[in-house]
């Protein structure tokens, strides 16, 4: 009799995706982040569900309801901080996952990569709307500043912003719809992640060498299930250290002040994981130009397969491209730092130079370096 896991219609899908899946024998820990992102998503949906049971999406009571969760609900404080810091872990894993894709040329799986970029945008939208919900000062002013960027769109901009607000300013209608979207989007993300996985399993995983690994495959279980469990334990350890020892480390103190439309905080800034894009936005003096640069800073990932000029897929055997990649990482860290600084000398010029470097490396230096490497190898 055939094994039930291979014959049952539902079990068969799970089996082909997580048990008998042929995987390359040499994938490193950089391939752990996909499963970690899945765990982050499940964790966020569960903690979010329990928070939603006690939260009220109304401008008069939103801030109080979050305080109530932390003070009066059984283990409410840990659920709230796991959700807030879980978002940070989510983005750490996301950046590592995308960085892995760039380094090892995983973007050559076009459908998988494009759905990944759509997922990145969706997660960023979800995180932004979630940050508005506690209705603190930074929630309110962050929502005002970011939604206002859409007014830079010619002709329809102002109407679009007022349509999103549901009025003439960020108010009750805005908060209610942001809560609705923040609740539904994670489920859309889960569905997209399954499509992401579906397309990945059409081609099989890439590996560090970038060479086809059809000749040397091993079953996903037990080799990579045990490896993923180790990664998950380490991530949960890091998350719980953050939650239990310094839950407010990555938050903004301004968000412990209830939202006040009459009082603008001295420095409006988003959560740390958006700071690099925020720095790029601020480095361009023109409003529309800044918005375009902001969108392009992420959308540029879509063009990675077109910018790939090397005859090799991975950067494993390309030292010059490796140097450029790590300069790009350093540049992104610089942008993240600048995004959190006030708009004054010398931060303005550093931000502008780092923004130029970001686009220069991706659009010019990497393709040129790849071509030079091809010529050095007489290819």
Curated annotation (Swiss-Prot):
CDD domains, per the entry: cytochrome_b_C (cd00290), Cytochrome_b_N (cd00284)
TM helices/strands, residue ranges: 33-53, 77-98, 113-133, 178-198, 226-246, 288-308, 320-340, 347-367
Superkingdom of this protein's organism: Eukaryota
Topological type in the membrane: Multi-pass membrane protein
Positions annotated to bind heme b b562: 83, 182
InterPro entries referenced in this protein's UniProt entry, alphabetically: Cyt_b/b6_C, Cyt_b/b6_C_sf, Cyt_b/b6_N, Cytb/b6-like_sf, Cytochrome_b, Cytochrome_b_C_euk/bac, Cytochrome_b_N_euk/bac, Di-haem_cyt_TM
Keywords per UniProt: Electron transport, Heme, Iron, Membrane, Metal-binding, Mitochondrion, Mitochondrion inner membrane, Respiratory chain, Transmembrane, Transmembrane helix, Transport, Ubiquinone
UniProt keyword Electron transport present: yes
Cellular location(s): Mitochondrion inner membrane
Family annotation (Pfam families): Cytochrom_B_C (PF00032), Cytochrome_B (PF00033)
Listed GO CC annotations: mitochondrial inner membrane; respiratory chain complex III
GO biological process assignments: mitochondrial electron transport, ubiquinol to cytochrome c
Cofactor: heme b
GO molecular function: metal ion binding; ubiquinol-cytochrome-c reductase activity
Binding site for heme b b566: 97, 196
Note accompanying the cofactor annotation: Binds 2 heme b groups non-covalently.
Binding site for a ubiquinone: 201
Signal peptide, first to last residue: none
Family note: Belongs to the cytochrome b family.
Role noted for this protein: Component of the ubiquinol-cytochrome c reductase complex (complex III or cytochrome b-c1 complex) that is part of the mitochondrial respiratory chain. The b-c1 complex mediates electron transfer from ubiquinol to cytochrome c. Contributes to the generation of a proton gradient across the mitochondrial membrane that is then used for ATP synthesis.
Subunit structure: The cytochrome bc1 complex contains 11 subunits: 3 respiratory subunits (MT-CYB, CYC1 and UQCRFS1), 2 core proteins (UQCRC1 and UQCRC2) and 6 low-molecular weight proteins (UQCRH/QCR6, UQCRB/QCR7, UQCRQ/QCR8, UQCR10/QCR9, UQCR11/QCR10 and a cleavage product of UQCRFS1). This cytochrome bc1 complex then forms a dimer.
Note: Heme 1 (or BL or b562) is low-potential and absorbs at about 562 nm, and heme 2 (or BH or b566) is high-potential and absorbs at about 566 nm.
Protein name, entry field: Cytochrome b
Taxonomic source organism: Antilocapra americana
Name of the coding gene: MT-CYB
């Amino acid at each position: 009799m055939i094994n039930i896991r291979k014959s049952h219609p539902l079990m068969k899908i799970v089996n082909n995706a997580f048990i008998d899946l042929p995987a390359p024998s040499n994938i490193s820990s950089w391939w752990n982040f996909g499963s970690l992102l899945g765990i982050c998503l499940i964790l966020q949906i569960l903690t979010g569900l329990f928070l939603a049971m006690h939260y009220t999406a109304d401008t008069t009571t939103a801030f109080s309801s979050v305080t109530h969760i932390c003070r009066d609900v059984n283990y409410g404080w840990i659920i709230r901080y796991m959700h807030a810091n879980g978002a940070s872990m989510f983005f750490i894993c996301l950046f590592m996952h995308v960085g892995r894709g760039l380094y090892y040329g995983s973007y050559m799986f076009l459908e998988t990569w494009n759905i990944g970029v759509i997922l990145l945008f969706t997660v960023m939208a979800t995180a932004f709307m979630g940050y508005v919900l506690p209705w603190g000062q930074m929630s309110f002013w962050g929502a005002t500043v970011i939604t206002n960027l859409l007014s830079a769109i010619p002709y329809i901009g102002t109407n679009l912003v007022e349509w999103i607000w549901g009025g003439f300013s960020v108010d009750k209608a805005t908060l209610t719809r942001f809560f609705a979207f923040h609740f539904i989007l994670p489920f859309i993300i889960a569905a997209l992640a399954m499509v992401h996985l579906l397309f990945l399993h059409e081609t099989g995983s890439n590996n560090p060498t970038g060479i086809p690994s059809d000749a040397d495959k091993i079953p996903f279980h037990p080799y990579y299930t045990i490896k993923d469990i180790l990664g998950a334990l380490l991530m949960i350890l890091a998350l719980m250290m953050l939650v239990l020892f310094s839950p407010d480390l990555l938050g903004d103190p301004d968000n412990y002040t209830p939202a006040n439309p009459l009082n603008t905080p001295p420095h409006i800034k988003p959560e740390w994981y958006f700071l690099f894009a925020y720095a790029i936005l601020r480095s361009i003096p023109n409003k529309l130009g800044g918005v375009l640069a902001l969108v392009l800073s992420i959308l540029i990932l879509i063009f990675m397969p077109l910018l790939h000029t090397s005859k090799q897929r991975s950067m494993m055997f390309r030292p010059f491209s490796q140097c450029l990649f790590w300069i790009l990482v350093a540049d992104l860290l610089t942008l993240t730092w600048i995004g959190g600084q006030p708009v004054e000398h010398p931060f303005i010029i550093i931000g502008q130079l780092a923004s130029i470097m970001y686009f220069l490396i991706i659009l010019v230096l990497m393709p040129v370096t790849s071509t030079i490497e091809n010529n050095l190898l007489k290819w």
